[in-house]
């Protein structure tokens, strides 16, 4: 774990690590991405409120909570938006969609034997150090692997009669901007990456990006959602178990797609 000295810039904004620390880490040639963090007080915001702002500002976003087996409440809430890469794989067809800083997108499609080989390349390319004072996740891949993903490791396994659903074998996104609620310290941590290829310019871009993130949280527009309404005439025939529950034949029924 690397020390992250606090640096105060104009206006008393707390950011870390220092540019000198980032230079030292870059000289090791071990990391291509160094996380840069800016702190805000969390007394004015909640994870759900920020999620509504991100949902309005970005096509893709997420909210993940952390909790160990010994905790009732997790220390961290992780949020992210504007992924720089979208990676999906279905039946060995791998699609990668990248988005640059100007919003220009590019998509590649190819056949693969195992998508894990591509994922390992991406992880190596964006290898990030663990920094003191920062949470365990400071950016990276977020998404899911379906049950069907096992077929890439067990090629002899035959998956027959697969339901035609919207689920892909793998659906991941690469997030560089991360917003973390540290509930223990009552702080909001804004995190983005400094790429070591062009360190000085990347550092300046990262500082500007952190300011944009802070302004988005403070002044961003909230997404408004319509309330969910289920009409009895349309949905009741799909749930005949309701009568069975009333009659005492079942205590609970959980409906799911797969």
Protein language model features and the residues they cover:
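Short, Lys/Arg-enriched N-terminal segments with co-localized hydrophobic residues
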Residues: 2-14
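Exposed boundary/loop context
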Residues: 4-5, 73, 132-136
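Extended accessory regions or peripheral subdomains of proteins
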Residues: 11-56, 60-61, 66-111, 147, ...
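Short acidic (Asp/Glu) patches
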Residues: 115-132, 155-166
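Short, hydrophobic/aliphatic alpha-helical segments
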Residues: 120-134, 241-253
